[in-house]
């Protein structure tokens, strides 16, 4: 059987939709369950799951720490995910991809600017139609900030993210995931439209985060009935005098 490789983005472990599909309300329990599936896949099928180091590994570690996950989660990350730095100097990307990315970013920046301008006009219009008693200037300023500006800024931030950030590679870890997957000829696991879009451009296989656990479960359902032990244990027992070393792929 061909050994498969996967490169995980942080969202492969933290995606809310994935937890809901698996039936876990807690982030930490969801992460444990996914990592346990990865462990089973490693032991039974030799499937390797990589994480770019240090960028994505650091994100995962900090995410688990911020959300109060116990040391077991970090131990599972360290044990079952292969930490590897992407070779940024040897993996080449065609100039056409780079050209398209620059053009795409320029378009998104212009769209973001349009959203900002609309927000400014909306705020100015709202202010013009409010009463402004001169003897209550301080109270009026606070009211404008609270009732008008605050709400508009909130809407602006959401619209700006949607217009500018959705569908682009907006962080170094995102790029590391794609470079490492390209280097290893591996599939990317993520819940990020930007990574999905540019994985397609780079010819890298993409598996949505909410599909990945079910894929591993499907593999495990088709284990031979007499295979009750991990693959490497069966192999070692069949060889007398084996050194007991495990070759990780």
UniProtKB/Swiss-Prot annotation:
Organism: Methanosarcina barkeri (strain Fusaro / DSM 804)
Enzyme Commission code: 3.1.26.5
Pfam families given in the database record: PIN_5
Catalysed reactions, as listed in the record: Endonucleolytic cleavage of RNA, removing 5'-extranucleotides from tRNA precursor
Xref: InterPro entries: RNA_free_RNase_P (IPR014856)
GO biological process assignments: tRNA 5'-leader removal
Primary role: RNA-free RNase P that catalyzes the removal of the 5'-leader sequence from pre-tRNA to produce the mature 5'-terminus.
Keywords: Endonuclease, Hydrolase, Nuclease, tRNA processing
Compositional bias per record (Basic and acidic residues), positions renumbered to this chain: 232-242
Protein name: RNA-free ribonuclease P
GO MF annotation list: ribonuclease P activity
Family: Belongs to the HARP family.
Entries under CDD domains matching the protein: PIN_VapC-like (cd18691)
EC class name: hydrolase
Region (Disordered): 226-249
């Amino acid at each position: 059987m061909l050994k498969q490789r996967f490169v995980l983005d942080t969202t492969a472990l933290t995606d809310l939709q994935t937890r809901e599909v698996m039936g876990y309300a807690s982030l930490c329990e969801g992460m444990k369950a996914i990592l346990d599936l990865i462990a089973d896949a490693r032991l039974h099928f030799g499937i390797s799951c990589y994480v770019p180091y240090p960028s994505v590994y650091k994100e995962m570690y900090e995410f688990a720490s911020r959300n109060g996950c116990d040391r077991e989660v970090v131990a599972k990350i360290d044990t079952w995910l292969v930490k590897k730095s992407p070779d940024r100097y040897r993996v080449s990307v065609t100039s056409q991809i780079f050209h398209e990315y620059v053009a795409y970013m320029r378009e998104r920046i212009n769209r973001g600017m349009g959203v900002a301008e609309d927000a400014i006009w909306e705020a100015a219009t709202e202010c013009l139609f409010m009463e402004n008693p001169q003897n209550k200037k301080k109270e009026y300023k606070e009211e404008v900030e609270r009732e008008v500006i605050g709400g508009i800024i909130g809407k602006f931030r959401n619209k700006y993210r949607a217009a500018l950030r959705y569908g682009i590679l907006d962080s170094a870890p995102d790029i590391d995931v794609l470079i490492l997957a390209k280097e290893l000829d591996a599939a990317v696991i993520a819940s990020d439209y930007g990574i999905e879009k540019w994985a397609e451009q780079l010819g890298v296989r993409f598996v949505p985060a909410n599909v990945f656990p079910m894929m591993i479960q499907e593999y495990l359902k088709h284990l031979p009935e007499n295979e009750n032990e991990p693959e490497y244990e069966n192999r070692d027992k069949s060889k007398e005098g084996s050194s007991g070393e495990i070759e990780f792929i």
